[in-house]
């Protein structure tokens, strides 16, 4: 068996076209969607992510505001900026790029963002709404995965799904979204015993653990849908510098029915969902203003 590859770039391009049309319609009515991005420190990976988000905004017709702070900035300065952005009606989405330097309380920073502008979906109220299957801004990576599964027509109701990883950013919300869709979900992590037992019976496997090529083909049920959320850079050997996921693509693609590549799989959809959340926020703002 050779798995069919889920092309995240193609799906993202299609969805971004729809988002751009919605953004243009809003702008024509006097409300241009706007995303504010705050970057603290000089983490190279964070800087790359922020540049990608800003560039994606520009292409979609979404205005972006970028605020950069030094590594040693007083957290009070950032909190003051968040308060100002919360109060600015022209700003519809606010994103603080993680991770933050050690002097910050990340949870407090995320809670300081207005729920109505929390386009990353990390505020406790949005997480709570997700857990109750209520309308909420959804975390972008799990939301992107759900869009991919929907686009591929993967049956979720009654499916056995395994999520490997329990982070607040991916693992936990991913499990909640799959549960809300009717799947029977098992969350596995570093203390899970006999991981192969769980993955071997799963119709859907979502790998989000940050370990290069950890999930191999012999761990999978034939025909399974495999979603690789990981992105790792190989640091040594002949493949040094190359990006790979948490799934060993070569072996897994011989067993799976559907599989996402790295790069070009989940990554493009993550930023796409950020754009969609920003436009949704702007649409709500326009409706409230009678535009």
Swiss-Prot record:
Keywords annotated in UniProt: Amino-acid biosynthesis, Histidine biosynthesis, Hydrolase, Methionine biosynthesis, Multifunctional enzyme, NADP, One-carbon metabolism, Oxidoreductase, Purine biosynthesis
Pfam families named among the record's database cross-references: THF_DHG_CYH (PF00763), THF_DHG_CYH_C (PF02882)
EC number annotated for this UniProt entry: 1.5.1.5, 3.5.4.9
GO BP term (any one): tetrahydrofolate interconversion
Matching PANTHER family: C-1-TETRAHYDROFOLATE SYNTHASE, CYTOPLASMIC, C-1-TETRAHYDROFOLATE SYNTHASE, CYTOPLASMIC-RELATED
Subunit structure as annotated in this protein's UniProt entry: Homodimer.
InterPro entries from the UniProt entry: Aminoacid_DH-like_N_sf, NAD(P)-bd_dom_sf, THF_DH/CycHdrlase, THF_DH/CycHdrlase_cat_dom, THF_DH/CycHdrlase_CS, THF_DH/CycHdrlase_NAD-bd_dom
The family this protein is said to belong to: Belongs to the tetrahydrofolate dehydrogenase/cyclohydrolase family.
Matches recorded under SUPFAM superfamilies: Aminoacid dehydrogenase-like, N-terminal domain (SSF53223), NAD(P)-binding Rossmann-fold domains (SSF51735)
Function field: Catalyzes the oxidation of 5,10-methylenetetrahydrofolate to 5,10-methenyltetrahydrofolate and then the hydrolysis of 5,10-methenyltetrahydrofolate to 10-formyltetrahydrofolate.
HAMAP family assigned: THF_DHG_CYH
The protein, known as: Bifunctional protein FolD
Gene Ontology molecular function: methenyltetrahydrofolate cyclohydrolase activity; methylenetetrahydrofolate dehydrogenase (NADP+) activity
GO cellular component, as recorded: cytosol
Domain of life: Bacteria
Pathway(s) the chain acts in: One-carbon metabolism; tetrahydrofolate interconversion
Binding site for NADP(+): 165-167, 190, 231
Catalysis: reaction(s): (6R)-5,10-methylene-5,6,7,8-tetrahydrofolate + NADP(+) = (6R)-5,10-methenyltetrahydrofolate + NADPH; (6R)-5,10-methenyltetrahydrofolate + H2O = (6R)-10-formyltetrahydrofolate + H(+)
